[in-house]
Amino acid sequence: MKKILAFLLTVALVAVVAIPQAVVSFAADFNYGEALQKAIMFYEFQRSGKLPENKRNNWRGDSALNDGADNGLDLTGGWYDAGDHVKFNLPMAYAVTMLAWSVYESRDAYVQSGQLPYILDNIKWATDYFIKCHPSPNVYYYQVGDGALDHSWWGPAEVMQMPRPSFKVDLTNPGSTVVAETAAAMAASSIVFKPTDPEYAATLLRHAKELFTFADTTRSDAGYRAAEGYYSSHSGFYDELTWASIWLYLATGDQSYLDKAESYEPHWERERGTTLISYSWAHCWDNKLYGSLLLLAKITGKSYYKQCIENHLDYWTVGFNGSRVQYTPKGLAYLDRWGSLRYATTQAFLASVYADWSGCDPAKAAVYKEFAKKQVDYALGSTGRSFVVGFGKNPPRNPHHRTAHSSWSALMTEPAECRHILVGALVGGPDGSDSYVDRLDDYQCNEVANDYNAGFVGALAKMYEKYGGEPIPNFVAFETPGEEFYVEAAVNAAGPGFVNIKASIINKSGWPARGSDKLSAKYFVDISEAVAKGITLDQITVQSTTNGGAKVSQLLPWDPDNHIYYVNIDFTGINIFPGGINEYKRDVYFTITAPYGEGNWDNTNDFSFQGLEQGFTSKKTEYIPLYDGNVRVWGKVPDGGSEPDPTPTITVGPTPSVTPTSVPGIMLGDVNFDGRINSTDYSRLKRYVIKSLEFTDPEEHQKFIAAADVDGNGRINSTDLYVLNRYILKLIEKFPAEQ
């Protein structure tokens, strides 16, 4: 009691520092509905494991499908942490707790904006993973992936090759911080799932209780070692124990959990050199004390907790005890150079939640609400540029994110810019003078992370509650794929009776990135001149001494009546993938030789010789077609021959309710039946694939299916969308279904 009285006396004597005004003022009229929608979508780009068929983008694919195998478990799923591919459960669980807290506070906003199914789906993606990580009451796997190994490679998640060990804590080697945070995440999530899926909510709550007991019993982080240097627990574990017990109280109504939360008060961090509860940092992945104080104030109404959280929010707004967080010249509340915006926007969420509570003084509520809006608007672009990828004016284009960059050579410099739009990602933000450069290699100001977006989503939901906004109907992040597979070639040497060709098979796939061990190419020749000289096919030989592991054939018939043959360059069994300078392409040198003699051999009439130059510089050529299995993915072929039946290697979805059949008068690809095949057809097919287009007329549905099955495999899914896009871009001349 003496401690509390001394605390209140100190509070009565504090000095107040005025909040600075921004030097530059821009319009702050933003579409909070769209921003909320996109900030939620960010988590779909972070997904690890086997992705659902109804995913809302076309550049993420299945990845890390063997996670946990080193310990005989299935630890697939969850989110990659940031721009890397380690699954750090401490910040992941924090992000889940924050997202669930936002739904707890603003469920109506999510319903009204149409975003409730999406945020619940994203939360569940992580909580399903946490369930896998908790195979028994006192065992918890807190990390998958080795930070050093992961950070030493720069490439997309879908083609990772490095070992991904999994790490656990148990009674012998405990980790109270990460276990308690996961308990909080599971408890908070159980609350928001209870109205729609009470059985799943009960499962989450059971895990939350077991995890909390495990964390509270051990009270040690001795076994939490693999994340050191990345996500070390600087604040200790008592803030997480407090946080978790509060969420368990809210989930169960069990007074013992609330009593437990309050019992940790002697262990709460104090402001340096004082007996005051800490107020001068931020609610974040490491420190949950401030959110705990806010919830305790609302739950108990006790003046002690109320004063503690107000000290903290005052420090971030008008100042407290003679000090205040730094502000940039343009008005950003600036705590730290590493991810400055995640702190400011998370504080905006806390300020909004507290200001909306009836127990908050109206004058303070007005200050906190103004602060929250200014910080959110700063992130959205009030100073002239957005800090949210894919939103607003001049948004970041090159966040520090391996999969969004999608390098095929494992080099941060190649390509020059990110190939993908990481929609909704909040970047780290500017420095203390508002300076910011959109640089891929800047992991302090331009990286993104699960914890960055977590409080930001909550703040946006609060802005949507107050100011509204319109989410984009049926929004998806489908991109037009760029060139992924192709062949480069050059003439190494040539003479009267031979030609030596260097050909490079290249995989720069990114929609999504994927390896293939079924790539092959065809080099076409016309031997008419040799035949005219009486030379037979068996007198023409093909040799290859440097082939990168490929099987190089002798001449095979394509159109023998017209003397057209080809060399088959087959890399079957060799995985060519966009993951390094020696992995994304394979070179092959081969020589075609005819009996020596004037006029016995003429390269100029060969289909695949067109456009090739002699020398060391290879050039892209569409006259050497490339195949993935039986599907031609690049280039042209000469007339007269026939290609094998296409067998797409892309995983296909379920059979539609209407079986594709040939319908008279229907043109393949013309899914809107206007007699043309263009981007309008692509958009309509995309709506169908993501299940935002439905048919009430069975006959019209049958016509649509007949036109949409462009790959001819009897199913309508993203494969058809991919093939149709290639046709529209003139990368293929015929649909596989026509071949």
Curated annotation (Swiss-Prot):
Gene3D superfamilies registered for this protein in UniProt: 1.50.10.10, Dockerin domain, Endoglucanase-like
Region feature (Catalytic): 28-470
Reactions mediated catalytically: Endohydrolysis of (1->4)-beta-D-glucosidic linkages in cellulose, lichenin and cereal beta-D-glucans
Taxonomic path: Bacteria, Bacillati, Bacillota, Clostridia, Eubacteriales
InterPro entries xrefs: 6-hairpin_glycosidase_sf, 6hp_glycosidase-like_sf, CBM2/CBM3_carb-bd_dom_sf, CBM3, CBM3_sf, Dockerin_1_rpt, Dockerin_dom, Dockerin_dom_sf
Signal peptide: 1-27
Domain named CBM3: residues: 480-639
Calcium keyword on record: yes
Pfam families on file: CBM_3, Dockerin_1, Glyco_hydro_9
UniProt name for this protein: Endoglucanase F
Record-stated family: Belongs to the glycosyl hydrolase 9 (cellulase E) family.
GO molecular function: cellulase activity; cellulose binding
Single GO BP term: cellulose catabolic process
This protein's record includes keyword Zinc: no
Listed cofactors: Ca(2+)
EC number(s) on file: 3.2.1.4
Task of the protein: This enzyme catalyzes the endohydrolysis of 1,4-beta-glucosidic linkages in cellulose, lichenin and cereal beta-D-glucans.
Residue ranges of domain Dockerin in the record: 664-737
Annotated catalytic residues: 84 (nucleophile), 400, 438, 447
Alphabetical keyword list: Calcium, Carbohydrate metabolism, Cellulose degradation, Glycosidase, Hydrolase, Polysaccharide degradation, Signal
